[in-house]
Amino acid sequence: MSSADIARRAGGITERSVRYRLERLVSSGIIRVSAVADPKALGYPVLADVFIEVEPGQIMTVARTMTEFECVTYVACSTGASDLSIQIVAPDNAGLYRFVTEVVANVAGVRKTTTVLLPLVLKDVYQWTIPKSTCTD
């Protein structure tokens, strides 16, 4: 959406003000402007979360290893039943299965994996908006 469109939708603000505010938000690191590819459109319609239990002392090593795989879209350290959470995309269920059982399971330090297919995503991270209760001007 252009700065002019934002100014029109907001009402009472100039395009120049919108550009200035956006530049401030970007330069301060509050927002990032980036393109997000649609995995389905690129031939990766299968999406899954994989929860990983890791050997003690190996969490960061395994986490860093997971970031190196192209089909892994998200890596996070977690608490609770699993130590890591990753999200992966695959061309089909067989590809997902192979990646989890032949790649993830064989990474040094991985103790156990639990895979959850995500057939429908209603809201993705790039759709998050700042809660009105925390907005200040």
PLM region descriptions:
Residues M1-D137:
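A compositional/biophysical signature of low hydrophobicity enriched in polar/charged and small residues
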